[in-house]
Regions:
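C-terminal motif of bacterial Sec signal peptides marking the signal peptidase cleavage site
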Residues: 7-9
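Post-signal peptide N-terminal segment of mature Sec-exported envelope proteins
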Residues: 18-36
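Active-site mouth of glycoside hydrolases
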Residues: 38-256, 261-269, 280, 380-384, ...
Length: 431
């Protein structure tokens, strides 16, 4: 499974099954987070003029990284691979402090949803306790937070590697794309989440779903054909996500809401996402293009940056360089000009050993800056050796050598830190 581990972004291994009728108890012994975290939320001072949405609208202000966690399943997880808690891998305060020390000022928590994935769709108190602890540690490290739900009613983490064969197909949960009860429960999960965290000073965004993927489930990757066949059906994210937004706004009118498009939130699917009449929306995308370059595995590192290869699956070789990236990312400018919307990149990256990865990152982040986009790198892993030894393709702290699994000074990290050094604002500036 090492190949799986190293090649997937936003998609790490795991099953997250909740037995029917179980509402998990909030028992400290089941927390995935090593150490204790404060339970009291920092809130904005009365009369504070801090507007969370302003962090998304005035040029690039948030530069940081994603964390990744899923529910632990002993059926598929070996020994202490993800730790012995309910969710893993386990993060500590030192992990968040380390992210902040390198200059990041925000973390996108790519986290299991806090309602169960199987019916009855009810609050999962252990998932909620874990999210509380993660937010608390981010706050202690002076980091802004975006909550991004990977899973929830009718969807588990296996959806991100649905065609792999290391788990039983019966454990794959994807009925959220064809069952109204699951979709309504996802709406209620977000209503509950917004009511719980709306006054939290460091929570500056709700990301409704990590990488909507009905296109793969329905096996239709052509944009226009997908919407011709499935537009305005129960499988259409455009039909469903506004219900989530409306539910959030019933209890929280202020916190920015992030939403990505179909196709695993790839940028070329964003123009097909319906724009809502909500003044505090952020339209987000994940940027791993060209995928055949950013996700190569040794020894087959045939594509370089800059380089010449088929980058758009049309059978013709393309010159892939900064101009290619700028042209692809010009979709952002087109959408901004057309709709006047706010956008962000809440996942991006390249596997650390790709030829030319340093130059690729410099060019890509430079374009993000020119476009005024906030951006979160994939991924900031915890210091958990059983995990780090097997899953480290996106761990920039390990440098370009694929066999290295220890932190080492390297140019890849230097480039990232150089961009993070541009951060000027932190939660403590407003409290």
């Amino acid at each position: 499974m090492i190949l799986i581990f190293t090649t997937l972004a936003c998609s790490q291994v795991g099953n997250s099954e909740t037995p029917e009728n179980e509402v998990v108890s909030n028992d400290e012994s089941t927390s995935n987070v090593a150490g204790e975290a404060p339970r009291q939320y920092p809130t904005l001072e009365p009369g504070s003029d801090f507007d969370k949405f302003s962090l998304w609208t005035n040029g690039t202000q948030l530069r940081g990284a994603n964390t990744w966690q899923r529910l632990v399943d002993p059926q598929y997880d070996d020994d202490d691979f993800l730790g012995d808690g309910y969710i893993g891998p386990p993060y500590t305060q030192d992990d968040f402090n380390g992210l902040a020390a390198l200059g990041a000022n925000y973390v996108n928590l790519s986290h299991p949803g806090i309602f169960t994935e199987r019916p009855p769709y009810v609050l999962d108190e252990k998932a909620q306790a874990n999210l509380d602890a993660m937010i608390a540690m981010a706050a202690e490290a002076d980091l802004f937070v975006v909550i991004s739900f990977r899973t929830g009613p009718g969807r588990n983490d296996f959806t991100f590697y649905r065609d792999d064969d290391w788990f039983d197909s019966d454990d794959l949960i994807e009925n959220v794309w064809y069952e109204a009860d699951a979709q309504q429960a996802w709406v209620e999960m977000w209503r509950y989440t917004a009511e719980r965290y709306r006054d939290h000073a460091v929570v500056v965004g709700y990301d409704l779903m990590c990488e909507p993927n009905a296109v793969e489930i329905l096996d239709e990757w052509e944009h226009d054909q997908f919407y011709a066949d499935y537009g305005n059906t129960i499988s259409d994210w455009n039909r469903w996500y506004p219900q989530i937004v409306n539910a959030i706004r019933e209890v929280d009118t202020q916190t920015p809401i992030l939403v990505g498009g179909e196709g695993y939130s790839a940028l070329d699917w964003l123009p097909y996402l319906n724009i809502m009449d909500d003044p505090r929306m952020v339209y987000a995308f994940h940027q791993y293009a060209p995928h055949m370059y950013t996700h190569q595995e040794p020894p087959f590192l045939t594509h370089t940056y800059p380089g010449k290869f088929d980058a758009d699956y049309d059978g013709q070789k393309d010159i892939v360089d900064q101009d290619w990236l700028a042209d692809y990312l010009s979709i952002v400018t087109d959408l901004s000009d057309q709709h006047g919307i706010v956008m962000a990149v809440n996942e991006y990256g390249v596997v650390r050993w790709e030829p030319g990865a340093v130059e690729f990152m410099v060019d890509e982040m430079s374009i993000f800056e020119e476009l005024g986009l906030n951006y979160a790198l994939w991924v900031w892993d915890p210091d958990w050796p059983p995990w780090n030894e097997g899953v480290n393709g996106f761990n920039f702290r390990y440098g370009e050598n694929p066999s290295n699994t220890e932190e080492t000074p390297n140019e890849f990290q230097d480039v990232i830190v150089e961009f993070w050094a541009r951060n000027e604002v932190r939660p403590s500036d407003f409290n």
